[in-house]
Regions:
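Flexible loop/turn connectors
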Residues: 254-255, 260-323
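Flexible loop/hinge segments that line or gate small-molecule binding clefts
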Residues: 112-152, 170, 265-273, 277-278
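Hinge/cleft segment of the Venus flytrap/periplasmic-binding protein
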Residues: 36, 174, 178, 193, ...
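Hydrophobic alpha-helical segments within soluble ligand-binding/sensing domains
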Residues: 82, 144-171, 215-216, 264-268, ...
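N-terminal secretory signal peptides
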Residues: 1-13, 17-27
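C-terminal segment of N-terminal export signals and the immediately downstream linker at the start
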Residues: 28-41
Length: 358
């Protein structure tokens, strides 16, 4: 992953923080900025995941642009740890902070928002929250929730896969965490595509919890179980898709069995260019990591009053880009070769409609 757009994050001193009489897990911080400036905090799943590593890079870029202390919290897929680490930062900063969080699971969002409200901090959530939890119920501290509609993109990747298979054959599918909103929506998109394509048979669907290791194990088992019956592999994210590609390489079938993912990470785009994957969807995690902080920071510093913003600024879909063999090279040249240059003041520029709940 030492490639241009995913060189990783700069080294930062790992420090320990105390909360509720116990020591929370380490977080990564950039120190030495003005005491009056709010600390900006990204809470993500893992720095070893290329998607979240790029999210973190965007957060660091925003923090540098405003001269703020930057803290990265890593949950490693542990909800209790994620919530405890955020509460520890709230205690450490006295609430003088902005938090941009991708909750490990939907139920995690509520205690996080409630803790931020109680501490006077400002928070933006992304991807996961309960449907009945809304920013306007926690004014002004719960600034916004950002997501991407998983159904159309899950369906688009299934359709790209089916096209690469010639419209017939068997597929296996790798899903995310069961109670995770994006995982549920992307699976629904897959189901819709399957219903519309009678020539495609779903051989098996297994949850791999967004993890490459689990996806590799499941794909290897499938290759043994189903053999040549597998004509394609659909994965709910790129990490799992790339694990499937790795299994296919070992089996001598990479490039022969198309694979699709979602996230638009560099390795996935490169795999599409090589012909080992058929598609992915780019969310721009650099934008997510930086703009989520920027929205919260602008609210915290008084640039706008969240309570006066329309609901389609409080809960909104961002914009994804479908990448296939037709546009992978041009996307790579425009978005990966060099570090993105974003206007951090354009906080509503990618609003793509208010989130709808079924």
């Amino acid at each position: 992953m030492n490639t241009p757009a995913y060189r990783g994050v700069s080294r930062r001193r790992v420090i320990q923080i105390a909360a509720a009489g116990a020591i929370a897990a380490p977080f990564v911080a950039r120190r030495g900025f003005a005491a009056g400036t709010p600390t900006v905090v990204n809470s993500i799943r893992s720095l070893t995941n290329p998607y979240h590593a790029t999210w973190n890079k965007g957060g660091a870029a925003f923090a540098k642009s405003v001269g703020a202390e930057y803290v990265t919290l890593v949950t490693e897929g542990n909800s209790e740890k994620g919530i405890a680490d955020i509460k520890a930062v709230l205690a450490k900063t006295g609430g003088n902070c902005v938090i941009n969080v991708d909750p490990n699971d939907s139920p995690d969002a509520r205690p996080i928002v409630e803790a931020c409200k109680a501490a006077g901090a400002y928070v933006v959530t992304q991807w996961n929250k309960p449907n009945d939890l809304h920013p306007w119920d926690f004014d002004p501290n719960y600034v916004a929730h950002i997501s991407f509609s998983g159904v159309p993109y899950g369906k688009a990747m299934a359709e790209a896969l089916f096209k690469a298979m010639g419209g017939k054959g068997g597929i296996v599918a790798l899903g995310g965490t069961q109670s995770n909103v994006p995982a549920i929506e992307r699976k629904k998109g897959l189901d819709e595509a399957l219903a519309a394509n009678s020539g495609i048979q779903l051989l098996d669907y297994q949850v791999a919890n967004w993890q490459a290791t689990a996806a590799l194990e499941k794909t290897n088992a499938w290759l043994t179980q189903f053999g040549d019956k597998i004509g394609g592999i659909w994965a709910a994210n790129d990490d799992m898709a790339l694990a499937a590609v790795e299994a296919l390489r070992a089996d001598g079938r990479a490039g022969k069995v198309p694979v699709t993912g979602i996230d638009g990470i560099q390795l996935a785009v490169e795999a599409i260019i090589k012909g080992e994957m058929a598609g992915t969807v780019a969310w721009d995690p650099y934008w997510q990591g930086g703009m989520g902080l920027s929205i919260g920071y602008h609210a915290k510093t008084g640039a706008f009053d969240p309570s006066k913003e329309p609901k389609d600024h409080r809960e909104f879909y961002g914009k994804g880009v479908v990448i296939t063999g037709d546009n992978a090279q041009s996307f790579y040249d425009s978005n990966i070769k060099s570090e993105p240059k974003l206007d951090w003041n354009d906080i509503w520029g990618r609003c793509n409609g208010q989130i709808q709940y079924s």
